[in-house]
């Protein structure tokens, strides 16, 4: 398996001119980089990944710990919003409170034979580096990489594998991921096996000598099924297999799959990280130096890195992510409870409800049930009426926005899946998916009630 770090490094900013005891800091393991014009001192004993001038990954960065205070109190961990609001822009000489946008394609070099820290934005950009470092910290990862979309991020992961390799993938996942797995990845000679990842026996029986990756969602999209990330990771690692978890529905606020044993976590940053339906972006966060090097190579070689302005938009959205997620989740719980007792609703899929079969497992690996739920009415006509009759829910694909959204997956986000396949997986046409926003929850409930009550019998 890929190597994992056992220490977390620190950096410290010093007024070097005020130090009178010569090698005091050097004796503690700190050094000032040669030719550095800043006052930054770097710990030489920690594990770090970053891109050097020749675009290789080297062992000199911090993604997990940013101060001696954090390291000296290992049991204390600041809250997510505290981390986000106090994350420093190390590259900015003016210490702007809002991370600057380096909206440039290329960077001037000091000479014809010596390169500076950045040369071309495809290979690296200070604004993207700031976002990637922050996301790595939130996901407890060694490195994070930002791409132009969630699908671009997943496509990059798929390029880790070659002809003859096998991927075990969940059968209840986002429609775009399903299309990638069923219609694109097999073109490279990679074999994709589809299983119900909430059934551990089915997962175990799918492993073979060529298996290289298990790809899953928990909760799944759109039926909100729960998979045991930790046990699947144990099974996979015993066979030398990687585990990827699409964590888009949960976000870093509610679940950290890398802490549960996953090797790769993916987020569609379009969703809760951006949070306002104004950005399309994807994130891959990984554990281990080897995997980080491979992902950076692919991001750079393919040219799929997120543009500076889009990175800046994500940095703005992420500041309120925890506040939004908490508000949206609280409202979603109330809406799910309302729908569960509504006479015109046959079934509600939401892990926050007592009757959900994966509820206990979910809360053992996540902090909450999130704000995405789905329900069945038993009637395509009624479901269509509900979706088209609400006032405060916009009919659209996607989720995780401050605006409440509603959709019929079989005709929208999952329409690319053949009808026979959808039916075999239990994905019926009357399924309605809701993404709860930040509107007044009583207004949202009343809106759903009138839409359900006024529908055809």
From Swiss-Prot:
* GO annotation terms (biological process): 'de novo' L-methionine biosynthetic process; transsulfuration
What are the temperature characteristics of this protein's activity? Answer: Optimum temperature is 50 degrees Celsius.
Which cofactor is recorded for it?
pyridoxal 5'-phosphate
Q: Which residues bind pyridoxal 5'-phosphate?
A: 120, 122, 150-151, 268, 270
Primary localisation category: plastid
Keyword field contains Nucleotide-binding: no
Under the heading InterPro entries, the entry gives:
Cys/Met-Metab_PyrdxlP-dep_enz (IPR000277), Cys_b_lyase_euk (IPR006238), Cys_met_metab_PP (IPR054542), PyrdxlP-dep_Trfase (IPR015424), PyrdxlP-dep_Trfase_major (IPR015421), PyrdxlP-dep_Trfase_small (IPR015422)
GO annotation, cellular component aspect: chloroplast
UniProt xrefs under NCBIfam families: cysta_beta_ly_E
Name of the protein: Cystathionine beta-lyase, chloroplastic
């Amino acid at each position: 398996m890929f190597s994992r770090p056992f220490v977390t490094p620190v950096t410290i900013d010093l007024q070097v001119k005020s130090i009178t005891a010569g090698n005091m800091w050097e004796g503690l393991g700190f050094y000032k980089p040669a030719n550095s014009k800043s006052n930054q001192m770097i710990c030489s004993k920690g594990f770090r990944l970053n891109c050097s001038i020749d675009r290789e990954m080297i062992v000199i960065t911090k993604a997990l710990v940013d101060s001696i205070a954090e390291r000296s109190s290992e049991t204390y961990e600041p809250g997510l919003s505290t981390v986000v609001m106090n994350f420093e822009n190390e590259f900015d000489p003016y210490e702007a409170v809002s991370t600057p946008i380096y909206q440039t394609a290329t960077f001037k070099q000091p000479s014809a034979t010596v390169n500076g820290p950045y040369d071309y934005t495809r290979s690296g950009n200070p604004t993207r580096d700031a976002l990637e470092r922050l996301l790595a910290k939130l996901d407890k990862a060694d490195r994070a990489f930002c791409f132009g979309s969630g699908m671009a991020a997943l496509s990059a992961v798929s390029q880790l594998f070659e002809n003859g390799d096998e991927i075990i993938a969940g059968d209840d996942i986002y429609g775009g991921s399903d299309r990638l797995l069923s219609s694109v990845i097999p073109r490279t000679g990679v074999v994709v096996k589809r299983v119900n990842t909430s059934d551990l026996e089915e997962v175990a029986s799918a492993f073979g000598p060529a298996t290289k990756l298990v790809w899953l969602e928990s909760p799944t999209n759109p039926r909100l099924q729960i998979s045991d990330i930790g046990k699947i990771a144990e099974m996979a690692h015993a066979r030398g297999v990687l585990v990827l978890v699409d964590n888009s529905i949960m976000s870093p606020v509610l679940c950290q799959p890398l802490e549960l044993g996953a090797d790769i976590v993916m987020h569609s940053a379009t969703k809760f990280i951006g949070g306002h339906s104004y950005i399309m972006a994807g994130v891959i966060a990984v554990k281990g130096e080897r995997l980080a090097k491979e992902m950076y190579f692919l991001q750079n070689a393919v040219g799929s890195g997120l543009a500076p302005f889009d990175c800046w938009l994500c940095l703005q959205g992420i500041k309120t992510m925890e506040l939004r997620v908490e508000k949206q989740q609280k409202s979603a719980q109330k809406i799910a409870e309302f729908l569960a007792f509504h006479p015109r609703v046959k079934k509600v899929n939401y892990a926050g409800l007592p009757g959900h079969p994966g509820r206990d497992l979910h809360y053992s690996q996540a902090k909450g049930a999130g704000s995405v739920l789905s329900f069945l009415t038993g009637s395509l006509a009624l479901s269509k009426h509900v979706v088209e009759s609400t006032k405060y829910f916009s009919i659209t694909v996607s989720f995780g926005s401050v605006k409440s959204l509603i959709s019929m997956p079989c005709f929208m986000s999952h329409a690319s899946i053949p009808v026979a396949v959808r039916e075999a997986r239990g994905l019926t046409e009357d399924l309605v998916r809701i993404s709860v926003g930040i509107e007044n929850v009583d207004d949202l409930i009343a809106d759903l009630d009138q839409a359900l009550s006024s529908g055809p019998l």
